[in-house]
Curated annotation (Swiss-Prot):
Its EC number is 3.6.5.-. Monomer. The keyword DNA-binding does not apply. Residues 1-159 form the Obg domain. It comes from Cereibacter sphaeroides (strain ATCC 17025 / ATH 2.4.3). This is GTPase Obg.
Length: 342
């Protein structure tokens, strides 16, 4: 499946139908009076988060969504038919942004969450509405309200509990494949991963979701490599797992490169809880492992896990550390949503 996480969409709600000018005409009724009906309301445009989608690719092939207008009113007090609403079905985690590309209109983070993007125009009044004690036969009606034209951006930020970070070929996809049901492409060359991948991880009877994004390189914030736009997909994560290639001779520099890109990206990403793991220890001798782990711990100021995605060494320890951070974040979120009771 092709992946698309940003697209521009043009929407228009339907206009209201015009009111009707009509008078009752029946045999033996000389002054039947007005009986013009109202116009129907125009269709509205909505966005709704649905299950089963993880890309915005459908919006590459259709960018224009125009709701139908309401039908005009008719005689005998008949109201025109209202236009049908249009619902844009988007993946959970989609942000809806105004045309200025800065103002967030809505953030759809739950299945079934819905937001009104453009209200349909009201139908015009028929002449029956204008009947009064002083005007028994009004000969006027209102036109319907026009629809609303709007341009919006849809931006997808995948919802995951943990995010994988690292330089290209740090072993992120191998780690994801070894710990989850995901089967990302794995090869011995940089930028094997071109789009984000999600995997469900199980540890001690608990499950959480890990997101693997394409590797970052120095200058990614300036557009080098694949850029840093994929970092948006780990913004919602509770914890980040930073994988460092233990076979690299510049292991400390590699670590600092990723940290620098996180800081350059901005937002709260650099301040998120972070776990560091030195990968590929199956290709290192014990002394190399000890020396490079010590150097990395000095640079990070904290514990560094040693793992091998290929051999499966140390993976459960890292997963338990990730779960501890995720479980704590979920507990804090529950406390924030507890309703107040006297």
């Amino acid at each position: 499946m092709k992946f698309l996480d940003l697209c521009k969409v043009y929407i228009r709600s339907g206009g209201g139908g015009g009111g009707c000018v009509s008078f009752r005409r029946e045999k033996f009724i000389e002054f039947g009076g007005p009986d013009g009906g109202d116009g129907g309301n125009g269709g509205s445009v909505w966005a709704e988060a649905v299950e089963g989608l993880n890309t915005l690719i459908d919006f590459r092939y259709q960018q224009h969504f125009f709701a139908k207008s309401g039908q005009p009113g008719m005689g005998s007090q008949r109201t025109g038919k209202s236009g049908e609403d249009i619902v844009l079905k988007v993946p959970v985690g989609t942000e809806i942004i105004d045309e200025d590309e800065e103002t967030v209109i809505a953030d759809l983070t739950e299945v079934g969450q819905r937001i009104l993007l453009a209200q349909g125009g009201n139908g015009g009044w028929g002449n029956l509405r204008f009947k009064s004690s002083t005007n028994r036969a009004p000969a006027r009606a209102n036109p319907g309200q026009p629809g609303i034209d709007r341009t919006i951006w849809l931006r997808l930020k995948l919802i995951a509990d943990a995010g994988l970070l690292g330089l290209p070929n740090a072993g992120k996809s191998t780690f994801l494949s070894a710990t989850s049901n995901a089967r990302p492409k794995i090869a011995d060359y940089p930028f094997t991963t071109l789009v984000p991948n999600l995997g469900v991880v199980g540890v001690d009877g608990k499950e959480f979701v890990i997101a693997d994004i394409p590797g970052l390189i120095e200058g990614a914030s300036e557009g080098r490599g694949l850029g840093d736009q994929f970092l948006a997909h780990v913004e919602r994560c509770s914890v980040l797992l930073h994988l460092v290639d233990g076979t690299s001779s510049t292991i400390v520099k590699d670590y600092r490169t990723i940290i620098g890109e996180l800081e350059a990206y901005g937002g709260d990403l650099a301040g998120k809880p972070r776990i560091t793991a030195m990968n590929k220890i199956d290709a290192m001798d014990p002394r190399q492992i000890s020396d490079r782990r010590r150097a990395l711990e000095k640079a990070t100021g904290g514990k560094v896990f040693t793992i091998s995605g290929v051999a499966g060494t140390g993976l459960m320890e890292v997963l338990r550390a990730l779960w501890a951070e995720i479980d704590g974040a979920r507990g804090d979120a529950v406390e924030e949503h507890v309703p107040w009771q006297p």
